Amino acid sequence: MIKAFSSEVDPGSREESASKKQPAAAEITEDGFLGGQLRLRQPKSGHRAGHDAILLAAATPARSGDRVVDLGSGVGAAGLAVARRVRGIDLVLVEIDPDLAELARNNAAANAIKAEVVILDVEAGAAAFDDAGLAPDSADVVLMNPPFNDPSRHRASPDGVRQRAHVATATTLAAWVHVARRILRSNGQLALIWRADGIAEVLAALDRGFGSLEILPVHGDATAPAIRILVRAVKGGRAPTRLHAALLLNEESGVPNKWVQEVLAGKGELPLARR
């Protein structure tokens, strides 16, 4: 069994948190998100947070007082972005890599966001989640950005961490959705992002235990196929599936879409976030 390590970040412990062991400074960058409202330290190479994490956060239907669990949080980008938009959530960041988890812990403290950081493999099993305080029916909202690149079409990176963060196995999505179903309360909310050409995999994974799906396709522009899908699902939901109008990252002229820019700057949310 994989032993989980959990630590709670107090927003007042910035100096102590900053002194914790991290990768060498030369290997780390500090980047601004949400128009500078969120500052994140992350590895210069390997898996780096970007637009996917912020779009996922903007699609997450969290409310003040909710227990929100970010599975595979990396350095905390998506979960911390949710906490910046929705004050008063009880945030848990779950990450398998100890170095990324430590960066997530420090990022939470540096941004004065209270968060619990758990070092745990999402596919570790129910007992490990119980040990980490993530028992069945204990979360109101789960968000996830699982590894989603198809290994048959994606050249594996020599960087093991990068490969694990980006390349899915045949069971990755189903396993992560199973975890979300177990830890969510009845009528709990799941938000996820996946590659658009894998929509059939998403629908199959959500077929058991989830309903009331809302799907938002993300396109580079109006002339291109969707590159991502953002999906919201409800544990035990029974409402019909809704397909939203496409989210265009760029106008036909190549100019960035103003609404998307507002969302990325932390000035708005996506329709899936409303409940």
Ranges and model annotations:
Residues 65-74:
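Conserved class I S-adenosyl-L-methionine
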Residues 75-88:
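Conserved SAM-binding loop of SAM-dependent methyltransferases across substrates and taxa
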Residues 225-275:
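SAM/dcSAM-binding transferase cores
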Residues 25-63:
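Class I SAM-dependent transferase core
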Residues 104-105:
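Conserved SAM-binding loop
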